[in-house]
């Protein structure tokens, strides 16, 4: 069994007028599929997506149509650092407008949070 190394609390920055959605997925094509889901759910939505790979070089894949939101998503994903986690920042839409579209992406397994309120993520670390 992996050795438990502790718990880390990650503060997720959420600028005024922005919402964040954090979830889990299991496929390398997640970013492309989430991009399509968001852009078709709400015309005019602004967003940034980041996804942490779980193997290999453990890259962070990202995309979006707003540079500020892409940077926020990348930094939040990097801070969380857990494989298969995705972070989406949205503007000009609400989570209720996109959650069903996100949940219908076949590789999405779970939504952990969708909010504009202060948010922390608790990460358990092992070796």
Regions found by a protein language model. Give the residues of each.
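N-terminal, charge-rich interaction modules
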Residues: 1-62
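Long, charge-patterned amphipathic alpha-helical coiled-coil/hairpin "stalk" segments used as oligomerization
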Residues: 59, 65-127
